[in-house]
Amino acid sequence: MISKSLAALVATAALFAASAGLAQPAGPAPTEGDFAIHDFHFQSGETLAELRIHYTTFGTPRRDAAGHVVNAVLIMHGTGGSGTNLADAPMFSGELFGPGQLLDASRYYLILPDDIGHGASSKPSDGMHARFPQYDYADMVEAEHRLVTEGLHVDHLRLVMGTSMGCMHTFMWGENWPTMMDALMPLACNAVQIAGRNRLWRDMEIDAIKSDPAWKGGDYTDEPLQALRTVSDITIIAGSAPQQMQKSMPTRDDADAYLAKALHRYMALTDANDELYAVASSRDYDPSARLGDIVAPLMWVNSADDFINPPELGLAEQQVKLIKQGTFVLLPIGPNTHGHGTHTWAIAWKDHLADLLAESGPKSAP
């Protein structure tokens, strides 16, 4: 998920999935909590007296004879999303977390954080507005690591995986703590500096917010609605899946009605500063120089209908060669792909997750 408009699209898809029979299977109930990090220092030089990181977990950590956790799985969301979004999405958790499924929550300890600026974690809309520290991906990954190690006392991860922004964070985890995990699964991203069209649409969203007089330098009382309307339009296109959209909106009236509903939902859910910060946080992402530091088996999955990571660039095919145990899979366009949002539809890629789990990590089941 890349922004709250895409998060809204995923939520809409979740409702569709539920009505189509993808009900959430019974399993352990989630536990939610908050981890406070005091005097958090950001890459920008700013500090926050207390950074709140919200999280959702399923299951119970299990330890080996030496006391190391053997069954923890870290799952990271996309820009504008949250761990709760993934936990509540039938096409994701409903395909993975239930009894007998690949990440059965009765066997694994599943950790789904809300990143800085997202969900119920500390964010600009809590009250600081544009005075909130200018966080970036390095800050977010550091906070994730401190949650896992200091907050939840997990010293080893069976699997690190993430969608979109979380996909990019997955590469950073593999580089920063290469021996901490048994396997990595980045879903829907590339491992280079964000440039070209991928940078352009982000710049367009940032400019739309900052150039709206109603934004008032971030100190608005009422949301800058024209800015949010433009951002919503851009992200709908960025997250588009032509075949799925044609199927679900076969007439002009269908398309017009969809746009109106998507815009209404987006405007109701979104704070402009939160959106601005979230989109801008990718500004210095570039793991390309350290891909060779990744030692855990890595299964990298993109889809051929992803507007944000277009397959014709061939970036992943070249980069995966730099990863010692890296495998790249490009999913062909089909009934189970949903553009960039394919990352949330586990039915499209869970067979590759099964392969990764079988080929990596402890040989005994958790």
Task: State what each model feature region is.
Residues A138-R158:
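Conserved acidic catalytic loop of the alpha/beta-hydrolase fold
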Residues I294, W300-N302:
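Short beta-strand/loop motif that positions the catalytic acidic residue
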Residues Q325-P366:
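Catalytic active-site module of serine/aspartate enzymes centered on a nucleophile-bearing elbow/loop
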Residues T56-D126:
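N-terminal cap/lid subdomain of alpha/beta-hydrolase-fold enzymes
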